[in-house]
Amino acid sequence: LAAMFGLHASFTLSPETLAYVREANTDKLGYHIHVAEGASDETDSIEKYGLRTVERLYQEGILGPNTIAGHCIHVDAAEINRLKETDTMVVHNPESNMGNAVGAPDILAMYKAGIRLALGTDGYTSDMLESYKVANCLVKHRSGLPNQGWGEIPTMLFENNRRIAGQFLKAEVGIIKE
């Protein structure tokens, strides 16, 4: 059994709420939060706090090796670097992103930066193989290159998902062995 703080998204969290959560997190649980899912997330953060979403969450002490950042569609190169620097995990939710018409993240840039990327659904579906298929098509569509994603997407689903789950469950999961 494991727990995390579910924070929803930057645009729903005041500085006071983030401070309260940090102070309440005496057990050093992880956080999961939607990050830059829509372009409006970045606009909101810049207008209210003068910072892009990832930088705001960094300054508020939310990013780190026990944080799962969902989506990260509208992050720029500096934000990708900050996610890597803090060892924050990113979960790509391709069907949810398409269904909400919010865009597609630059999975290849994040992968090349060395970010721990996993594949999720954000509750849009329960079929991870369908998410795999959609993610594979979407990375090709976004990059304009039909030969992309063949290594990255399987790694996200079959390796990184189980490693991230194992990190929080404190157990090896997702491997069939003798």
Feature roles, as predicted:
Residues 1-89, 100-117:
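Histidine/acidic residue-rich metal-binding segments in metalloenzymes
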Residues 17, 45-47, 79-81, 87, ...:
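Generic alpha-helix signal with a bias toward terminal, lower-confidence helices
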Residues 36-37, 94-99, 122-124:
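Short, acidic/turn-prone active-site loops that include or flank metal/cofactor-
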Residues 59-62, 66, 106-178:
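His/Asp/Glu-enriched, well-ordered alpha-helical/loop segment
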